Structure formats: structure tokens, C-alpha cells
């Protein structure tokens, strides 16, 4: 049994119109020849779980048209993955390949993130796999995001002058203040939320539950108090 509680402070980042209007080709050029090219070069290459397939290159070509704004193109790609693939927790396993998922047209957040990564990397655009959590207690009348009751996965791509910007192909939206980043890597194999070895007979089943709640200033003060910290370590 593994339990963890974490206090996270998140500041929402707003995309300036000048950044959002950049053509995707400019992002590609900067990722190859810019100052950060070496630092992000490994995120332009295929990885064990995100091979470069003809199918993913063809899929991405629908959105990465000549001169199209970078944010618009990538958000459109994420939205179409959300609408054209079915979220089905029973459809895939950790070892399901990207080609198998494409044939089924269904999967989970991990699969959709791998699909978007392969699409972007097939055009040599730098993109990384992000693992984290979603805020799963929205305001009244606002539906929960898909994947908010367990660990979640989405994609970040690099934009010149701004850095890494997140896109969620499971929910078809930009990753905003509701997304809590735990780590990132080339694909799921780099950043699995929990690793370990279980010894014993019989069948084993993994059960994951996540709760994310807003905390006001009073709650923050109580959480940070010496007495609270003492109680947690007792």
C-alpha cells in the first residue's frame, strides 16, 4: 500500500498572441538551429513506445499545414484525437503497441499521448510525455475531465520564446492550471508513476485512486503549521 499527500502551488500561464501566432515551421527551425536545440534534441527522436509510423505522419499532416499557427495546429490535433478515438480503460495494457492502438481506435491517456508524440516527432517537432494529475473537483455544473481519478498523461511541445506548452489529447484541450505535473520523459517507460517488483503467487491487480482538492489560505496555513507536520510524521 502506497499513500502520499502533496501540497502544490500552481500559477496559470497565459499564451501571448505573439507566441500563439507563430507558425509551426518556425518552432521546427528553432528546435534544430536555436540555442536550446541540443537540450531538446532527444525529444525530437523516436522512443521505445513512440515509433515513427507512416500512419502517424499521415494523421499529423491533416493539421500541420503550411504556415498554420503552432498552437492552433497542435490544439486541433489534440482535439481530433479526443473525438476520433474512444477512451476505454479495458482496451489496452501497458505493453500495447502504438500500431495496435491505432488499429483499435481506442485506449487511455497513455495511448493518446503516445499517438500525439509520434505525430509531432514524425515532423521532427520536439515533444515530451508528461505524467501527473488532474484537478478532479470542478465547480458545480462543470463535468470532470477524463482521467481525473487516477494518474494522467499528456504532451508538451516546445515553443520558441516560451518553452514547453502542454496539450491534452484525452480531453482535447490545452494543459492549464488544472494539470499538476509530476515528471516528464520520452514516453511512459521513462516516467511511470510507480515502479517495483512484486514477489508471490496468484494474480495481482493494481488499484489507483487520486483526489485533488482546492485549498484556501486558511487550509494552507493549517497544512504548513508545525503541529500538522508533527502529526504527519508521528
Show the residue positions of the predicted features.
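A structural signal for short, well-ordered beta-strand segments
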Residues: 4-6, 77, 155, 208-210
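Short hairpin/turn module used for nucleic-acid contact or packing/dimerization
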Residues: 191-234
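Hydrophobic/aromatic-rich core segments of domains that either
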Residues: 58-61, 79, 111-202
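Short, hydrophobic/aromatic-enriched beta-strand segments in well-ordered soluble domains
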Residues: 1-12
